[in-house]
Amino acid sequence: MENKADYQISSSVNNGILEVVLTGKAQGMTNEKMANELDDIIKANNAEKVIMDVRAIEGRLDSKEIYRHVRNHSFVIYELQVAVVDIPENAHYATAVKNAGLPFTWFIDIDEARTWLKSKQSK
């Protein structure tokens, strides 16, 4: 019997920006598995700028778990220019992520995220 993931990750590169769309459920160990897969996609594309569209993700880490996750795991995405696209109801995650030390910038409009990343010089 095949074990089907509760989430999906799709990606494409547009104008030098890796765009990743996460959908489905993110709970428990799924978050770490997704982060590892995301790292693999970033490495495979040699990306420096990433849009992470999480608007369709169900379930999130709480603020304490975000902090613990960042402190206990080292992922490539932590070193990149990242725009997170999310729904307005999840705006409090922007503060939690910033407090955990991640330099991600939050957007509710994907076109604004693209414009912001295009304005940034590559590292």
Predicted regions and their residues:
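Amphipathic, Lys/Arg-enriched alpha-helical "gate/interface" segment within cytosolic domains
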Residues: E2-K123
